[in-house]
């Protein structure tokens, strides 16, 4: 039976915890997954593509979107604005897709408040703060000051782990991929996603097998 609506999977956690790498596997395996492309005011990193990784806009344009109630959720992080379009999310849910968000703690709260029954959330982290810092250095996209800021922000994020449904400590990428895929498939199997009355009616319409006692 087809789902009557889609589901939401929220991924949060410190920058450098491996969310992007895990997402790549998720989208290879879950064919009807839809990545919610955020709008941001930050400068594009090398290799990032407009419309694929982010929608890049000016601060003025973003603030206009806030005024026009364009965003489902938005937040200011490290001096930059990030937000999610309402229209694109509603459209994907109507098509029965798994809508995947890579957003911060406040964004998770906003999504959970808007779609409490459809949302499954996962907090992804490294085993230690030191490993997080090492990954950020190896990534080579930020200077020391920015890395220090990201690690400091990670301390704040770690305090909110209890707000999430699942936690993945990303020690081993392959094992973490398996965990995330299991969670994603479970999210798509929630009872709330199905028209239960139609399911039961269809089940009842089938001929009931006779048992020895019914003869």
UniProtKB/Swiss-Prot annotation:
Any idea which UniProt keywords this protein has?
A: ATP-binding, Cytoplasm, Kinase, Nucleotide-binding, Transferase
GO molecular function terms listed in the Swiss-Prot or TrEMBL record:
ATP binding; guanylate kinase activity
Q: Name one GO cellular component term.
A: cytosol
For this protein, the record's InterPro entries field holds:
GK/Ca_channel_bsu, Guanylate_kin-like_dom, Guanylate_kinase, Guanylate_kinase_CS, P-loop_NTPase
Residue positions annotated to bind ATP are 13-20
**Enzyme Commission number:** 2.7.4.8
The entry's localization annotation reads: Cytoplasm
- Name the catalysed reactions: GMP + ATP = GDP + ADP
Keyword Ligase in the entry? The reply is no
Quote the SMART domains the UniProt record gives. Answer: GuKc
Sorted alphabetically, which Pfam families does this protein's record hold? Answer: Guanylate_kin
Ranges of residues in domain Guanylate kinase-like = 6-185
Give the matching PANTHER family. Answer: GUANYLATE KINASE (PTHR23117:SF13), GUANYLATE KINASE-RELATED (PTHR23117)
What the protein does comes down to: Essential for recycling GMP and indirectly, cGMP.
Q: Which family does it belong to?
A: Belongs to the guanylate kinase family.
Name of protein: Guanylate kinase
What is the scientific name of the source organism? Wolinella succinogenes (strain ATCC 29543 / DSM 1740 / CCUG 13145 / JCM 31913 / LMG 7466 / NCTC 11488 / FDC 602W)
């Amino acid at each position: 039976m087809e789902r009557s609506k889609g589901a939401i999977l929220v991924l949060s956690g410190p920058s450098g915890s491996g969310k992007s790498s895990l997402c790549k596997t998720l989208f290879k395996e879950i064919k009807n997954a839809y990545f919610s492309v955020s709008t941001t005011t930050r400068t594009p990193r090398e290799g990032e593509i407009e419309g694929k990784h982010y929608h890049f806009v000016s601060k003025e344009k973003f603030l206009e979107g806030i005024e026009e109630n364009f965003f489902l959720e938005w937040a200011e992080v490290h001096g930059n604005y990030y937000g999610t379009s309402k229209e694109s999310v509603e459209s994907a849910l109507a098509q029965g897709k798994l809508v995947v968000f890579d957003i911060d703690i406040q964004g998770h709260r906003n999504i959970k408040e808007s779609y409490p029954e459809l949302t499954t959330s996962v907090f992804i982290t490294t085993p230690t703060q030191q490993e997080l810092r090492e990954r950020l250095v190896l990534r080579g996209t930020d200077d020391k000051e920015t890395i220090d800021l990201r690690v400091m922000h990670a301390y704040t994020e770690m305090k909110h782990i209890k707000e999430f449904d699942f936690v993945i400590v990303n020690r081993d990428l392959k094992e973490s991929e398996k965990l995330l895929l299991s969670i994603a498939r479970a999210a798509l199997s929630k009872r709330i996603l199905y028209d239960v009355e139609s399911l039961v009616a269809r089940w009842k319409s089938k001929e009931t097998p006779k048992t020895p006692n019914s003869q």
